[in-house]
Amino acid sequence: MERFVVTAPPARNRSKTALYVTPLDRVTEFGGELHEDGGKLFCTSCNVVLNHVRKSAISDHLKSKTHTKRKAEFEEQNVRKKQRPLTASLQCNSPAQTEKASVIQDFVKMCLEANIPLEKADHPAVRAFLSRHVKNGGSIPKSDQLRRAYLPDGYENENQLLSSQDC
């Protein structure tokens, strides 16, 4: 009799797994949150291996509190570790840098008005006096740099001042 018993066909065991999905497919799907290494899917900020077959496992991980916490820490670390570009570092004008520039310009202007050659700034006695008695006086460069960098500025400033007085 067993031969004549009709049994129902086996139910299809359809799971919710994608059969032909690779970790690289999930990386392109979820963007910069994930990365693939050695055929495994990793969360970039948590550095945890994720199941690349189940999309729900990935989305649940990305919504979890631990992921959001670690992501914030990861981004904070990246901000601290990033190097500043050289141009940004050079353009940074702190109050000390602006004061230094104004002291040097005033020194060049004083030398020009008193007919003191800029080479006199290289004399050891002048250097000692400036460093002892003038605030930021030790930061005044040698005469060749004064001539190259600061003399043209003083010349332009004086020309503008004279042209504004002539009007």
Curated annotation (Swiss-Prot):
Provide this UniProt record's keywords sorted from A to Z: DNA-binding, Nucleus, Phosphoprotein, Transcription, Transcription regulation
Q: Major location, coarse class?
A: nucleus
Listed under GO cellular component are: cytosol; nucleoplasm; nucleus
Q: Note whether DNA-binding occurs among the keywords.
A: yes
Q: Does the keyword Nucleus apply?
A: yes
| Compartments reported by the entry | Nucleus
| UniProt motif Nuclear localization signal: location | 80-84
Q: Which InterPro entries match?
A: Cggbp1
Recorded GO molecular functions are:
DNA-binding transcription factor binding; double-stranded DNA binding; identical protein binding
Q: Biological process (GO) annotations? A: epigenetic regulation of gene expression; negative regulation of transcription by RNA polymerase II
Q: Which residues carry this modification: Phosphoserine?
A: 56, 164
Q: Which segments carry the region annotation Disordered?
A: 65-86
Miscellaneous note, as given in the UniProt record, is: Binding is severely inhibited by complete or partial cytosine-specific DNA methylation of the binding motif.
Q: What does this protein do?
A: Binds to nonmethylated 5'-d(CGG)(n)-3' trinucleotide repeats in the FMR1 promoter. May play a role in regulating FMR1 promoter.
**How is this protein named in the record?**
CGG triplet repeat-binding protein 1
Record organism: Mus musculus (Mouse)
